[in-house]
Amino acid sequence: MSKVTKKVEELVKPILEKYGFDLVDIEFKKEGKKHFLRVYIDKPGGITIDDCQLVSEELSNKLDIVDPIPFSYYLEVSSPGVDRPLVNDRDFIRNKGRVVDVFLKQPIMNTTKLTGELVEKNEDVLIIMIDGENISIPFENVKKVKVAIRF
């Protein structure tokens, strides 16, 4: 974690705690000639545009005072997006009960992709429910887990 992202985390956490939001990730990147500070937030049930705006305004005010970045940049506050894989324990807890796609290293039930409701994830096992039946998947066999996109 860079000094910038560490400082931003210190500034944003009290804001998120006040509203009951979770910090998912912070990125500070240069793209072309522009710098972007991206703060990804979430909450049970999903984050709204109004939630992002609220955090963006409060964080922007704090950043103007503390000024941890000595050059111009764009601040973006958003949800993690549906394409982001579930990575840490908070991701799995936050998405419990949602339908997920589990991509496997080795096939289970003759497939390397299972779709089901996320029941639980612990150190060793990921449990999803498929057609009312809990399926335990050794976490060492899990390549990636993403929230399933339904149309």
UniProtKB/Swiss-Prot annotation:
InterPro entries the record matches: Ribosome_maturation_RimP, RimP_C, RimP_C_sf, RimP_N, RimP_N_sf
Keyword Cytoplasm among UniProt keywords: yes
Main subcellular location: cytoplasm
Subcellular location(s) of the protein: Cytoplasm
One BP term from GO: translation
Any one Gene Ontology cellular component term annotated for this protein: cytosol
Superkingdom of source: Bacteria
Pfam annotation, one family: DUF150_C
Keywords: Cytoplasm, Ribosome biogenesis
Gene3D superfamilies (UniProt xref): Ribosome maturation factor RimP, C-terminal domain (2.30.30.180), RimP-like superfamily, N-terminal (3.30.300.70)
4Fe-4S listed as a keyword: no
Function description: Required for maturation of 30S ribosomal subunits.
Family per record: Belongs to the RimP family.
HAMAP family: RimP
Protein name: Ribosome maturation factor RimP
